């Protein structure tokens, strides 16, 4: 078996007229997984009496894949998360009445605000989804990772 080395020029210094070389071994391990090597599993979480922020941090870590040893920041290596009993989720302190969520329509004077109490009456899953969304990256990868979150009312889910 022949042992050979391939060198790559990483810097050429014209002043002193020498070359910095780095050795490239073709049999070295890759630091990141390829797309075809990624695997996903499913987690089921019961949100009964869970605090929104603490549950959102656990979910965002699972969705991003930070609980795996193969975590890669630029790839979607996370797992799917199913959350049930979302109507029984809670906030600490007086945040349920006092916290405000803002959104803007894009028109002048178009800022809208709502509290978790009003949001919980219409869409109980929206508060947790917003918390998880704001913990994920803001680009295309974050939007793709957010689709791995499934939230359902009650014990039964499809």
Question: Could you describe each region identified by the protein language model?
Answer:
Residues 26-130, 137-140, 158:
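Ribosome large-subunit tunnel/peptidyl-transferase-proximal elements
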Residues 141-158:
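Charged phosphate-binding loop/patch that engages nucleotide di/tri-phosphates or the phosphate backbone
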Residues 8-28:
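Short, Lys/Arg-enriched N-terminal segments with co-localized hydrophobic residues
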């Amino acid at each position: 078996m022949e042992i050979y080395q391939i060198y790559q020029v990483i810097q050429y210094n014209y002043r002193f007229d020498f070359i910095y070389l780095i050795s490239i071994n073709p049999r070295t391990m890759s630091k990141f997984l390829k797309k075809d090597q990624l695997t996903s599993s499913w987690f089921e979480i019961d949100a009964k009496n869970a605090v929104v922020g603490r549950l959102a941090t656990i979910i965002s870590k699972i969705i991003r894949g930070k609980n795996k040893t193969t975590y890669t920041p630029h790839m979607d290596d996370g797992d799917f998360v199913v959350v049930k009993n979302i109507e029984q989720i809670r906030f600490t302190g007086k945040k349920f009445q006092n916290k405000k969520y803002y959104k803007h329509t894009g028109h002048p004077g178009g800022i809208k605000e709502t509290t978790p109490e009003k949001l919980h009456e219409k869409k109980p899953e929206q508060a947790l989804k917003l918390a998880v969304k704001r913990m994920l990256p803001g680009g295309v990868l974050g939007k793709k990772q957010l689709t791995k979150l499934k939230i359902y009312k009650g014990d039964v889910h499809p």
